[in-house]
Amino acid sequence: MTKAEILTILKSDLEIAQTTTSKDSLLNNLIELSLGAVTREGITLSDPYTIEEGTLIEMYAAYLYRRRRDPESTMPHSLRYMLNNMLLSQKARLLNG
């Protein structure tokens, strides 16, 4: 999955028309921030991203977008769950060689 595909899914998730480009710069920045946050969690991302990785990046970017409107909002449990599962899965694969 490419960053352009992630942007398309993010726009759909946020109910932003695909033809609207006025927020693309902001959304692309949020995608980049999400990539950094996910890797800081210890998750290794492939190139190109798998569907699971792309979805995780999109979910994180959507969370950051929504948090801008409500700074008191907490991370959705589904996002935290996905982060934890991906990290544990990768660590288990490393241990099992």
Give short role names for the model-derived ranges.
Residues 35-38, 65, 69:
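Short alpha-helix boundary/capping elements
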Residues 55-67:
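Short, hydrophobic/amphipathic alpha-helical patches that form generic packing surfaces
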